[in-house]
């Protein structure tokens, strides 16, 4: 990437309202993960630009319930003829609910999404060519493995094509191959082959700007460094995360884990690391989430005599997360393969201090003055690192309130959805008048 432009210039947003066609195949205000990201970015952009969203038919009813008008605000593309059988096939091949996400992503991005784009171009191609839109922006799919066949067509029509934030496919860290196999991530061993695709090369050449959600994803687009910028895909809705955690700076410390109970997120590693503090009463732990590791954790907690210190809450509706998470002082989150880290930003927005494994997404969000990072290593090294980090916090709980305040300030400065819309607006300005280096609006940890 080129040197960063002025921070003020990079975050001020577009200079004028633009006519933007936002492609958000996955976008839904009633879901979480990628669909919520797609919805949130598209909605934030609507406050600054004249946006028309193109989404998949499965999201239509949620858009209508949210008050959007079909035809004026959005168009729902019916690609179910391909999407439905592909989803059924993926469910078979993933070999277990909640597993094999690389397989699911590959089938969707290589088979279902191209059909969606073909139908999109049939409807919007003439309008794009006629100059009805200033910019075409693909927000989702989030995965960098999904090629956009319409990118060269937009370029031929003279309309800038922007992609991103793109993220995903973070390599499994060394020492976690057993967890990789337990997650049925067989396809991850050959994921890198997608970079050989000719259609991918054509897409990259045609894109006016590529927004990467992480340094890893940015490294996969090195040939487009002059058009590459970094903006993490996750953000915060201040209305949804409006509570503030009490930070008395005293013991016991209330810690929380939020996420699916699967091997790579490491809830079992967390219990092992925190056991001495859970046992002596200096710490209590709330685990919010469900998944295949639930019976393992139940047995682990009972077998170690920690039932008074650890509460397994099970699945929690996303709208209710802030009520429970804001009762904690720490988010203890040893996930070893988190490409985004939305829950880390949610904790910071509540004034809850993150303690995370320093790898991929979370490691780029948490700075030394906003949380605690544990070096990545083998499973045993991560457990030992978390235990040492927790021991330091137990010994000095009065340091936590300052970290919490700085974490909240960082989110408000860079990671609300409105801030993200302004950051993307600065990219729009640049693609329409590319003077100087492409803006780099978000300071990541380590910079």
Regions found by a protein language model. Give the residues of each.
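N-terminal subdomain of nucleotide-sugar transferases
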Residues: 1-77, 156-159, 436, 442-447
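A conserved mid-protein helix/loop that constitutes part of the nucleotide-sugar donor-binding site
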Residues: 36, 253, 257-276, 292-298
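Nucleotide-activated donor-binding/catalytic signature segment of Leloir-type glycosyltransferases, i.e.
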Residues: 296-316
């Amino acid at each position: 990437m080129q040197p960063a432009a002025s921070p003020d210039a990079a975050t001020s947003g577009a200079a004028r309202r633009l006519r933007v066609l936002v492609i958000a195949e996955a976008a839904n205000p009633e879901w979480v993960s990628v669909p919520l990201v797609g919805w949130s970015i598209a909605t934030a952009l609507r406050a600054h630009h004249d946006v028309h969203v193109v989404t998949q038919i499965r999201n239509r009813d949620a858009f209508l319930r949210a008050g959007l008008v079909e035809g004026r605000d959005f168009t729902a593309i019916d690609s179910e003829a391909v999407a439905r059988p592909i989803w059924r096939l993926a469910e078979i091949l993933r070999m277990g609910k909640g597993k094999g996400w690389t397989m699911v992503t590959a089938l969707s991005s290589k088979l279902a999404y191209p059909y969606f784009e073909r139908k999109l171009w049939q409807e919007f191609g003439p309008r794009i060519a006629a100059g009805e839109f200033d910019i075409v922006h693909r927000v989702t799919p989030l995965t960098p493995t999904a090629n956009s066949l319409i990118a060269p067509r937009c370029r031929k029509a003279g309309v800038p094509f922007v992609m991103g934030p793109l993220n995903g496919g973070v390599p499994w860290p060394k020492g976690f191959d057993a967890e990789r196999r337990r997650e049925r991530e067989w396809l991850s061993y050959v994921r890198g082959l997608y970079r050989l695709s000719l259609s991918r090369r054509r897409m990259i050449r045609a894109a006016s700007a590529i927004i990467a959600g992480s340094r890893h994803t940015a490294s996969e687009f090195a040939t487009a460094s002059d058009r590459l910028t970094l903006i993490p895909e996750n953000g915060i809705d201040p209305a949804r995360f409006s509570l503030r955690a009490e930070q008395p700076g005293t013991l016991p410390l209330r810690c929380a884990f939020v996420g699916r109970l699967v091997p790579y997120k490491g809830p079992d590693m967390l219990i092992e690391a925190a056991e001495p503090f859970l046992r002596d009463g200096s710490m209590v732990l709330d685990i919010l989430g469900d998944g295949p590791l639930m019976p393992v954790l139940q047995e682990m907690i009972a077998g170690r005599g920690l039932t008074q210190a650890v509460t397994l809450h099970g699945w929690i509706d996303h709208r209710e997360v802030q009520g429970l998470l804001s009762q904690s002082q720490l988010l203890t989150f040893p996930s070893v393969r988190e490409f985004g880290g939305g829950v880390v930003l949610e904790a910071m927005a509540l004034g809850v201090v993150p303690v995370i494994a320093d790898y991929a997404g979370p490691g780029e969000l948490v700075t030394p003055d906003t949380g605690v990072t544990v070096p990545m290593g083998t499973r045993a090294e991560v457990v030992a690192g978390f235990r040492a980090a927790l021991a330091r916090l137990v010994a000095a709980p009065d340091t936590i309130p300052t970290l919490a305040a700085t974490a909240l300030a960082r989110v408000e400065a860079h990671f609300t959805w409105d801030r993200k819309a302004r950051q993307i607006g600065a990219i729009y300005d640049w693609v329409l008048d590319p003077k100087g280096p492409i803006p780099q609006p978000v300071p990541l940890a380590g910079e």
